[in-house]
Amino acid sequence: MSTEKSLLANAAGGSLVLQIFVGIIAGVALAGFSPEAANQVAFLGDLFVGALKAIAPVLVFVLVASSIANQVSGAQTNMRPIILLYLVGTFAAALTAVLMSFAFPTSLVLIDAAAGANPPEGIGQVLNTLLFKLVDNPVNALINANYIGLLAWGVGLGIALRHASTSTKNMLHDVSHGVSQLVRFVICLAPIGIFGLVAATIAQTGFEALAAYAQLLGVLLGAMAVIAFVVNPLIVFLKIRRNPYPLVFKCLRESGVTAFFTRSSAANIPVNMALCERLKLHEDTYSVSIPLGATINMAGAAITITVLTLAAVHTLGIEVDLATALLLSVIAAVSACGASGVAGGSLLLIPLACSLFGISNDIAMQVVAVGFTIGVIQDSAETALNSSTDVLFTAAACEAAERKA
């Protein structure tokens, strides 16, 4: 009996990762035992994701403004190398997806087109949407969680307050600290929230619908695994010149797991901010790089766009040469960086990539519908890769800067 109490005490008071693991097991068990009961606890997951999404825009705006307003003159923020890592990582992901698609060609059973979807007409429209998000009304940006706009206004307000009185800067810092405390409280609810998410997902899908797309999922998840465990560690090693895997596994464990179940990079911003704080990274850096990464660091999206497009190409018997494949990698990488500016994310950028091969919009939308069918796995894995990489590259750039100093 005392042993059981000890185990329960360790689970309740131990690491958040262990508590989340217990929540996952409990969710799977409940869904297997009683799907009806599992559906009844779905609201726990919705509440958790809703709380994260609610606090994230406020956190980003206040933290960015506070960090820049209180920044010491001449301090290094390391943003240039982080942005370069984001872009290199996204392009490498698209290239890896091309190689995986050629190595394991996949045919699709095309289904009805995704009803009501409204994909962008071209890369210009994607970039145009992003540009207008930059000058969005700040109140509207807060309400709609427009992180591009929040970053722009946060940076602008921070710069404007650089020469404000000390009391004003202290007030801004105190507000930032208060919001961070709220975030910590919400993150403590992760095990309960993930329990609800897992139970509801398994009860509602059962994963039977995914069996017909086993090979497609294999290529998608295989490409994401190569990026997470081979390419990203290689990039980080070149940056920090030491074994990257302890950092890689920490980011996947403490950021990727939560992102996998929330399926939202925006909702995972507070989790990533808290992880950066535990890693003792520069607040001036991660307060900007993490929300920026949630917007433009889209390795998972690049893989999804590339793999599904090449699956459609293979299904239709279209020949693809090396030059076209490389061009697809570039288009997928650029499109992925704009995925946050498109309702529906990476899946609705597939018609844009399909147009490179002359595939009609009707067929492209059937490919999108396939994407929605496997979304319970694809979207979760994509978000986990995207979000954990934000912290990984931020930490790598900060460590590299410290090593040079």
UniProtKB/Swiss-Prot annotation:
Q: Which UniProt keywords apply?
A: Amino-acid transport, Cell inner membrane, Cell membrane, Membrane, Symport, Transmembrane, Transmembrane helix, Transport
| Catalysed conversion reaction | L-serine(in) + Na(+)(in) = L-serine(out) + Na(+)(out); L-threonine(in) + Na(+)(in) = L-threonine(out) + Na(+)(out)
**Topology with respect to the bilayer:** Multi-pass membrane protein
Name of this chain's protein: Serine/threonine transporter SstT
GO cellular-component term (any): plasma membrane
Reply yes or no: does the keyword Translocase apply.
Answer: no
Instruction: Name a biological process GO annotation.
Output: threonine transport
This protein's encoding gene:
sstT
What the entry lists under HAMAP family is as follows: Ser_Thr_transp_SstT
Entry-linked InterPro entries: Na-dicarboxylate_symporter (IPR001991), Na:dicarbo_symporter_sf (IPR036458), Ser_Thr_transp_SstT (IPR023025)
The entry's localization annotation reads: Cell inner membrane
Asked whether the UniProt record includes Cytoplasm among its keywords, one would answer: no
The record's section on SUPFAM superfamilies has: Proton glutamate symport protein (SSF118215)
**Where would you find the membrane-spanning parts of this chain?**
13-33, 43-63, 82-102, 141-161, 185-205, 217-237, 298-318, 339-359
